[in-house]
């Protein structure tokens, strides 16, 4: 009959399932090769339904044709060697065949904390993994729709680097075909993870030029290199897009397996998400675009968009562009780039609670400068916010503990007659003015906030490789010596001793096992989450001990 205990156990079981997460401190990516390697011909994966002209160009396996690029546009000999670009926050490689970004490193985010000189690799087009950003010109006259294959661009240099004191870096790739000169321009800014990709079309032919710009992200089905989980709950790995009706719409790999998606949107964005990092194409806000997902002939997943028709009269010039973001999920930056893009920091269905929590945590960090201490202060503030609810819960538990001898007497009196025992217990609760749900409901009310905080600590890139003190050098991975999980288990045991013993023997056994079960689960939890739980437990113990002692003292005084 103990409804409160049943609900509490169920709630703990739900929390256990949601929060059981094992982290892997190996982010599994190698650095970019230091030497120029031959670029393999990559499939552009032109969006379905976009006119490919009358030449029947293949959308899956294009081939490069150097003869289509005139020598006068090539300051150096045409080459298929990758073009290297380095800024203060990006290291990338561009394939001259099509001008796709096929490799990209993030030097400000090391692959591992103990290897600070090996950057995390976001894009790769090697043998083990496929993840790249593609763009091009398709349509009736687009060079990416030619039967001879995608254009082979020429660059003035084989490598480019943002120099000290330089705020912007521009990389131009050039190509000419049938009297039309193309410049594919990559514009980088110091300290920024977004870059502008533009096409300058100079039509020197004797007729009008018509085409469309497309931009897309292509990825295989490999796992997330920045995260690994032990049970069914994981951070989202998949595509997402903006629509007029949904500012953040997920499109998982399973969704793409079931069939292609095609929507007409004005502006918007398309993105690929993984733990801590996001890649997004952001077209001009005024453009009417066709957003599409599909799977190519090699089994890779594609999300992208095709822009409106571009018309360039004979002798005319036109420029079209899109923004590419490839980097960490920094909410303030993402929000500046496009509406809804900050939602790619996926806090789950409780995002509306999680975002204010992160805002508060960020402001605390701006004062303290340490994410560990910030978590502690945030936990104290949240605990203070819910102090009245927690106090009501602990008072109910204290009263339950005070009547525990009477409950034991009822059990001995009625034995296995559960119906009579339940009736007698309800009469006792009524007499003692105890609400059997009084201790549980406040906990359930607080649970959404605690779960939202869990997702904040899990998903925020700011926690990645953030140190606290002493042996805790990374709050996003497990405690290397399991000290915090053991302390957490001890605090759970102490807190359990303050609670009344359940009258049902089975429930009592389950409750006794909870500290052991949670300690085992928390061995692999990120240290930041365990730190939150330890601080929360310590505050709960102090509050519960104080309330319990006061009620017990008042009970003894009344009895005397």
Curated annotation (Swiss-Prot):
<keyword id="KW-0812">Transmembrane</keyword>
<comment type="similarity">
    <text>Belongs to the OXA1/ALB3/YidC family. Type 1 subfamily.</text>
</comment>
<keyword id="KW-0653">Protein transport</keyword>
<comment type="function">
    <text>Required for the insertion and/or proper folding and/or complex formation of integral membrane proteins into the membrane. Involved in integration of membrane proteins that insert both dependently and independently of the Sec translocase complex, as well as at least some lipoproteins. Aids folding of multispanning membrane proteins.</text>
</comment>
<keyword id="KW-0472">Membrane</keyword>
<keyword id="KW-1003">Cell membrane</keyword>
<keyword id="KW-0997">Cell inner membrane</keyword>
<feature type="region of interest" description="Disordered">
    <location>
        <begin position="42"/>
        <end position="66"/>
    </location>
</feature>
<keyword id="KW-0143">Chaperone</keyword>
<dbReference type="InterPro" id="IPR001708">
    <property type="entry name" value="YidC/ALB3/OXA1/COX18"/>
</dbReference>
<feature type="transmembrane region" description="Helical">
    <location>
        <begin position="437"/>
        <end position="457"/>
    </location>
</feature>
<dbReference type="InterPro" id="IPR047196">
    <property type="entry name" value="YidC_ALB_C"/>
</dbReference>
<dbReference type="Pfam" id="PF02096">
    <property type="entry name" value="60KD_IMP"/>
</dbReference>
<comment type="subunit">
    <text>Interacts with the Sec translocase complex via SecD. Specifically interacts with transmembrane segments of nascent integral membrane proteins during membrane integration.</text>
</comment>
<protein>
    <recommendedName>
        <fullName>Membrane protein insertase YidC</fullName>
    </recommendedName>
</protein>
<feature type="transmembrane region" description="Helical">
    <location>
        <begin position="468"/>
        <end position="488"/>
    </location>
</feature>
<dbReference type="GO" id="GO:0051205">
    <property type="term" value="P:protein insertion into membrane"/>
</dbReference>
<keyword id="KW-1133">Transmembrane helix</keyword>
<dbReference type="InterPro" id="IPR028055">
    <property type="entry name" value="YidC/Oxa/ALB_C"/>
</dbReference>
<dbReference type="InterPro" id="IPR019998">
    <property type="entry name" value="Membr_insert_YidC"/>
</dbReference>
<keyword id="KW-0813">Transport</keyword>
<feature type="transmembrane region" description="Helical">
    <location>
        <begin position="515"/>
        <end position="535"/>
    </location>
</feature>
<feature type="transmembrane region" description="Helical">
    <location>
        <begin position="367"/>
        <end position="387"/>
    </location>
</feature>
<feature type="transmembrane region" description="Helical">
    <location>
        <begin position="1"/>
        <end position="21"/>
    </location>
</feature>
<dbReference type="GO" id="GO:0032977">
    <property type="term" value="F:membrane insertase activity"/>
</dbReference>
<dbReference type="Pfam" id="PF14849">
    <property type="entry name" value="YidC_periplas"/>
</dbReference>
<dbReference type="InterPro" id="IPR038221">
    <property type="entry name" value="YidC_periplasmic_sf"/>
</dbReference>
<feature type="transmembrane region" description="Helical">
    <location>
        <begin position="341"/>
        <end position="361"/>
    </location>
</feature>
<dbReference type="GO" id="GO:0015031">
    <property type="term" value="P:protein transport"/>
</dbReference>
<dbReference type="InterPro" id="IPR028053">
    <property type="entry name" value="Membr_insert_YidC_N"/>
</dbReference>
<dbReference type="GO" id="GO:0005886">
    <property type="term" value="C:plasma membrane"/>
</dbReference>
């Amino acid at each position: 009959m103990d409804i409160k205990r049943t609900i509490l156990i169920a709630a703990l079981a739900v929390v256990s399932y949601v929060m059981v997460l094992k982290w892997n401190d190996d982010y599994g990516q190698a650095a970019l090769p230091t030497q120029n390697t031959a670029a393999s011909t990559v499939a552009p994966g032109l969006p379905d339904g976009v006119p490919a002209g009358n030449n029947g160009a293949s959308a899956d396996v294009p081939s490069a044709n150097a003869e289509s690029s005139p020598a006068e546009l090539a300051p150096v000999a045409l080459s298929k060697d990758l073009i290297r670009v380095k800024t203060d926050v990006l290291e990338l490689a561009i394939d001259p065949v099509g001008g796709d970004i096929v490799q990209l490193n993030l030097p400000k985010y090391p692959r591992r904390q103990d290897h600070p000189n090996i950057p995390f690799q976001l894009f790769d087009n090697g043998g083990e993994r496929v993840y790249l950003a593609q763009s091009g010109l398709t349509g009736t006259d687009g060079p990416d729709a030619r039967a001879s294959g995608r254009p082979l661009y020429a660059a003035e240099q084989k490598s480019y680097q943002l120099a000290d004191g330089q705020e912007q870096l521009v990389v131009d790739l050039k190509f000419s075909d049938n009297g039309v000169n193309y410049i594919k321009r990559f514009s980088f800014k110091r300290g920024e993870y977004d870059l502008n990709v533009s096409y300058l079309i100079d039509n020197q032919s004797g007729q009008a030029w018509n085409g469309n710009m497309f931009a897309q992200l292509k990825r295989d089905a490999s796992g997330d290199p920045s995260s690994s989980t032990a049970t069914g709950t994981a951070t989202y790995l998949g595509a997402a897009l903006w629509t007029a009706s949904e500012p953040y719409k997920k499109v998982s790999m399973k969704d793409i397996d079931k069939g292609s998606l095609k929507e007409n949107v004005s502006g918007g964005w398309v993105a690929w998400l993984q733990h801590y990092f996001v890649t997004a194409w952001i077209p001009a806000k005024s453009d009417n675009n066709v957003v599409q997902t599909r799977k190519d002939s090699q089994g890779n997943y594609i999300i992208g968009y095709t822009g409106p028709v571009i018309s360039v009269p004979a002798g005319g010039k036109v420029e079209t562009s899109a923004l590419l973001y490839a980097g960490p999920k920094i909410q303030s930056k993402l929000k500046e780039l496009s509406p809804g893009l900050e939602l790619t920091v996926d806090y789950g269905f409780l995002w509306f609670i999680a975002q204010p929590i992160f805002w508060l945590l960020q402001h605390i960090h701006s004062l303290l400068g340490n994410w560990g201490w910030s978590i502690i202060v945030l936990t104290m503030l949240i605990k203070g916010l819910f102090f009245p609810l927690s106090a009501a819960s602990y008072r109910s538990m204290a009263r339950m503990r005070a009547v525990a001898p009477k409950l034991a007497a009822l059990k001995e009196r009625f034995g296995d007659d559960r119906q009579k025992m339940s009736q007698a217990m309800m009469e006792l609760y009524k007499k003692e003015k105890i609400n059997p749900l009084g201790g549980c409901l406040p906990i359930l009310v607080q649970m959404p906030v605690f779960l939202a905080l869990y997702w904040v600590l899990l998903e925020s890139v700011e926690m990645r490789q953030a140190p606290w003190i002493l042996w805790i050098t990374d709050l996003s991975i497990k405690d290397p010596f399991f000290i915090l999980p053991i302390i957490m288990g001890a605090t759970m045991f102490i807190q359990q001793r303050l609670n009344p013993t359940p009258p049902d023997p089975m429930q009592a056994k389950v409750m006794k096992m909870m500290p052991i079960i949670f300690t085992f689960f928390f061995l692999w939890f990120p240290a930041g989450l365990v730190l939150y739980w330890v601080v929360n437990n310590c505050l709960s113990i102090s509050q519960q001990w104080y309330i319990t002692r006061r009620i017990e003292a008042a009970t003894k005084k009344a009895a005397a």
